């Protein structure tokens, strides 16, 4: 098994390179930017259709009123994602351009959204256009429009093919003329694609693309498809790479299209049978975080004998319950630990197999409601499937099965840690024997016991003003310092940000920390003096360094165990911040 892990680690640089691909990153960040709209729209699905489970049905008129906010937000999510994806890709291209000759992201957003309408919207005789492909059905086309837009803009801006205005003209006016050529080229190219599609295929580009990828959508929902997809999530995380950065962009269009399809099936009184949805990923495959680790901290607390394992379990329970499982991933550790390779990969796959059985055989409705990823897994299953009876059973079954999968491997690991603890105890006993040969053992024990009591008292009591002053004097941070901690979604980064803020207040150090998600940081990073990358986004260090160097901001990345230790020791976290400014 150790040889397998070593072989896997050799491929890590290749997978990290894929995870940093600017087009995959743009897709993922584009979706992240649109999540507030998706979450807002899901509220109205809950209000409209959950009462059906309890025998209450809204009238058609009332249903239409309640669903209007959904239709006017989620119904145009393709249009919105075209703009947000273009914005993210523009940021990536701008890193490679001269700082005095940047692509205007507002212009690329508008051009991408306009181009999307050409490719996805059909005109109607009465005026206006149809919106059938402006929602999740048009997501693939949204990516096409965004990519074409930014590539064309980059071609023009990089070569200075623009209308140049005199220096006396205000910058905002000059920017308008600078964008005319690339914007015009984008619209002409996309309009040409639209004309070709309607002339030779007799349909819009969005529908044509959907037809091409339809077999892939169907295959992805099959047994082999779900095995490969959700196995990949866990595999990449196991080798220390943020799996969603690679897998999510590849399946994003499928998951959100399936979510809307399931809702449409429920509205029509039919069985919602699409398996791959955001809910399947967040609450079934990664229940409690990647690796289906919801049960693992509880098992560490209650089913192990090692003091170390019990302590790790207690420290990891709360964050893992809300899907933030880095404390157990790196604290145990689970990632790159040969003992946990099989359960970490296998548990998510088995969870999805069981879920698929419930949907295909027991006819439970699949997910039709989008919920925040921090929703506890069992609650997410119940709410996301509309409070169906089988969803309660499914949640219990998954918990039991995950315990059964992890248990034998946990016992093996616990024995390993116990052996280490026994070894340390033997070393301590040997040292004590050497001491007794030269000193009065009782007297030495009394001294050690007194020292231990004093240490305990010092640890448990609040620091005095003198102690605070002494500790503060050792820290060279005298001016207000803002620290931004970045992770993939904002949950893990909150652990370190909270630890820093608490320690800064306790030791009276002028440090303020905030948590953020990588990809949503570009517009706010200028307000910080230091950016810390959590382990899950540490592979992006070289990319973001181009931005921090330009702005004169310090940048630091962390490793798994190091990061978890910093979240648990506020003073060490402050020292880490200070060290970055001493380099």
Swiss-Prot record:
Biased composition (Low complexity): 453-462
Alphabetical list of PROSITE patterns matching this protein: PTS_EIIB_TYPE_3, PTS_EIIC_TYPE_3
Keyword Transmembrane helix: yes
Compartments where located: Cell membrane
Membrane topology: Multi-pass membrane protein
PTS EIIB type-3 domain: residues covered: 480-583
UniProt-listed Enzyme Commission number(s): 2.7.1.207
GO MF annotation, one: protein-N(PI)-phosphohistidine-lactose phosphotransferase system transporter activity
Positions of region (Disordered): 453-475
Induction comment: Induced by lactose, galactose and galactose-6-P. Repressed by glucose.
One annotated GO biological process: carbohydrate derivative transport
Active site (record annotation): 487 (phosphocysteine intermediate)
Reaction equations catalysed: lactose(out) + N(pros)-phospho-L-histidyl-[protein] = lactose 6-phosphate(in) + L-histidyl-[protein]
Cellular-component GO terms for this entry: plasma membrane
The protein's role, per its UniProt record: The phosphoenolpyruvate-dependent sugar phosphotransferase system (sugar PTS), a major carbohydrate active transport system, catalyzes the phosphorylation of incoming sugar substrates concomitantly with their translocation across the cell membrane. The enzyme II LacEF PTS system is involved in lactose transport.
Protein name per Swiss-Prot or TrEMBL: PTS system lactose-specific EIICB component
The encoding gene: lacE
């Amino acid at each position: 098994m150790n040889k397998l892990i070593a072989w896997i680690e050799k491929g890590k640089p290749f997978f990290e390179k894929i995870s940093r691909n600017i087009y995959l990153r743009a897709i993922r960040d584009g979706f992240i930017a649109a999540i507030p709209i998706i979450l807002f729209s899901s509220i109205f699905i809950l209000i409209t259709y959950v009462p059906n489970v309890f025998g209450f049905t809204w009238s058609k008129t009332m249903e239409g009123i309640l669903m209007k906010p959904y239709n006017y937000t989620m119904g145009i999510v393709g249009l919105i994602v075209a703009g947000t994806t273009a914005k993210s890709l523009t940021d990536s291209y701008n890193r490679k351009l001269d700082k005095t000759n940047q692509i205007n992201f507002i212009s690329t957003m508008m051009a991408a959204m306009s181009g999307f309408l050409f490719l996805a919207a059909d005109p109607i005789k009465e005026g206006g256009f149809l919106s059938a492909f402006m929602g999740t059905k048009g997501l693939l086309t949204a990516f096409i429009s965004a990519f074409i837009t930014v590539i064309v803009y980059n071609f023009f801006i990089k070569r200075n093919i623009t209308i140049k205005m005199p220096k006396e003209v205000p910058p905002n006016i000059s920017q308008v003329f600078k964008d005319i050529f690339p914007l015009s080229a984008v619209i002409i190219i996309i309009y040409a694609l639209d004309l070709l599609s309607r002339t030779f295929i007799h349909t819009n580009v969005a529908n044509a693309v959907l037809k091409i990828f339809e077999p892939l959508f169907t295959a992805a929902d099959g047994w082999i498809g779900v095995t490969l997809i959700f196995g990949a999530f866990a595999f990449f995380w196991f080798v220390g790479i943020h799996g969603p950065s690679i897998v999510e962009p590849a399946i994003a269009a499928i998951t959100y299209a399936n979510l809307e399809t399931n809702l449409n099936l429920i509205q029509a009184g039919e069985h919602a049978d699409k398996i791959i949805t955001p809910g399947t990923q967040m609450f079934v495959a990664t229940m409690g975080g990647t690796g289906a680790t919801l049960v693992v901290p509880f098992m560490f607390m209650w089913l192990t004998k090692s003091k170390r394992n019990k302590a790790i379990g207690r420290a990891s329970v709360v964050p893992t319950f809300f899907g933030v499982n880095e404390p157990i991933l790196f604290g145990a550790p689970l990632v790159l630990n040969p003992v946990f390779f099989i359960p970490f990969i296998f548990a998510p796959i088995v969870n999805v197999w069981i879920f698929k059985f419930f949907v295909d055989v027991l006819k439970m409705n699949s997910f039709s409601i989008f919920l925040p990823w921090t929703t506890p897994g069992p609650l997410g299953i119940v709410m996301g499937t509309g409070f169906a009876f089988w969803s309660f059973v499914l949640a219990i079954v998954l918990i039991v099965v995950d315990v059964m999968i992890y248990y034998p491997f946990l016992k093996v690991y616990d024995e390993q840690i116990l052996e280490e603890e026994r070894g340390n105890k033997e070393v301590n006993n040997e040292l004590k024997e050497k001491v007794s040969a030269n000193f009065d053992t009782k007297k030495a024990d009394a001294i050690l016991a007194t020292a231990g009591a004093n240490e305990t008292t010092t640890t448990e009591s609040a620091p005095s003003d003198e102690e605070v002053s002494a500790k503060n004097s050792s820290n060279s941070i005298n001016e207000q310092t803002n620290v931004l901690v970045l992770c993939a979604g904002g949950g893990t980064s909150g652990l370190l940000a909270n630890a820093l803020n608490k320690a800064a207040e306790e030791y009276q150090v002028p440090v303020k920390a905030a948590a953020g998600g990588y990809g949503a940081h570009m517009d706010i990073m200028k307000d910080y003096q230091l950016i810390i990358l959590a382990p899950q986004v540490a592979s992006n260090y070289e990319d973001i360094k181009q931005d921090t160097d330009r702005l004169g901001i310090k940048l630091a990345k962390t490793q798994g165990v190091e990061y978890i230790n910093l979240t648990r020791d506020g003073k060490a976290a402050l020292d880490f911040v200070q060290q970055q400014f001493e380099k």
